[in-house]
Amino acid sequence: MTAQVISGTELSKTIKSQVAQKIETYTQQGKRSPGLAVILVGADPASQVYVGSKRKSCAEIGIQSKSYDLPETTQESELLALIDELNADTTVDGILVQLPLPKHIDSTKVIERITPEKDVDGFHPYNVGRLCQRIPTLRACTPYGVMKLLETTGIDLHGKHAVIVGASNIVGRPMALELLLAGCTVTVTHRFTKDLAHHVRQADILVVAVGKPKFIPGDWIKAGAIVIDVGINRQEGKLVGDVEYDVALEKAGYITPVPGGVGPMTVAMLMFNTLSAYEMKIAS
């Protein structure tokens, strides 16, 4: 059995097109366009690529992107002052600070400084807390994108055993909350987990986000499982995921490719969240 490949590239185009249509409707009514402030501190090459794709998407769909490229030497106090300014700016609906930040800046303090209504990354404790209490507003982009990918399979998630490999604040933890909200029985594994293979083999839905190339052997995959590979790693000049794709492809029921799986969805959901933040503001 060869798995059906879930294309994030295709779904992300659909979502971005829907967002663009809504923005066009608002601007035709004489309303302003949504505004997204994107802050990059330093010159990390991967971060520059991610920020570039986010700004490009904004331009494509009609979101006004405001760019703040700050030097590596920027002080925490300067970054916090910029966030205060953007919080107060009525033309800015979303504020995104590209992570990771330089070592001398406390990312928790920075995330918490963004007003929750403009936290389009969905990382603020207030927004994570709302998801935890089953009343989500702005949801973390990658896990939210994964839920949209799972929807395309048409499979009822209620009662399915979902196993998450990796417990980061950005993917693993909010992913667990999303899957719980969808009615799954959720297991979260991490670096202290004993017998990882045992857990992975039981997964009806497997989400892997550890950032290690081919970390999960393909023969661990349960026959017919849905495999969501969040990892993007460079190996021998190629982009590969956290799952041994070729072997997993023969065992899974559905699988996301790398590249072209989860990556494009993260950006699409950022656009979706920016529109949501804008709509909440114009409604109030």
Swiss-Prot record:
GO cellular component terms listed in the entry, alphabetical order: cytosol
Keyword line: Amino-acid biosynthesis, Histidine biosynthesis, Hydrolase, Methionine biosynthesis, Multifunctional enzyme, NADP, One-carbon metabolism, Oxidoreductase, Purine biosynthesis
The EC number(s) this enzyme carries: 1.5.1.5, 3.5.4.9
InterPro entries: Aminoacid_DH-like_N_sf (IPR046346), NAD(P)-bd_dom_sf (IPR036291), THF_DH/CycHdrlase (IPR000672), THF_DH/CycHdrlase_cat_dom (IPR020630), THF_DH/CycHdrlase_CS (IPR020867), THF_DH/CycHdrlase_NAD-bd_dom (IPR020631)
HAMAP family (UniProt xref): THF_DHG_CYH (MF_01576)
Presence of keyword Ubl conjugation: no
Gene: folD
Gene Ontology biological process terms, A to Z: L-histidine biosynthetic process; methionine biosynthetic process; purine nucleotide biosynthetic process; tetrahydrofolate interconversion
GO molecular-function terms, A-Z: methenyltetrahydrofolate cyclohydrolase activity; methylenetetrahydrofolate dehydrogenase (NADP+) activity
Family, as annotated: Belongs to the tetrahydrofolate dehydrogenase/cyclohydrolase family.
Residues the entry annotates as binding NADP(+): 166-168, 232
Pathways involved: One-carbon metabolism; tetrahydrofolate interconversion
Protein name, UniProt field: Bifunctional protein FolD
Entry annotated with the keyword 4Fe-4S: no
Quaternary structure, from the entry: Homodimer.
Catalytic reactions of this protein: (6R)-5,10-methylene-5,6,7,8-tetrahydrofolate + NADP(+) = (6R)-5,10-methenyltetrahydrofolate + NADPH; (6R)-5,10-methenyltetrahydrofolate + H2O = (6R)-10-formyltetrahydrofolate + H(+)
Alphabetized NCBIfam families for the sequence: PRK10792.1, PRK14186.1
Function of the protein: Catalyzes the oxidation of 5,10-methylenetetrahydrofolate to 5,10-methenyltetrahydrofolate and then the hydrolysis of 5,10-methenyltetrahydrofolate to 10-formyltetrahydrofolate.
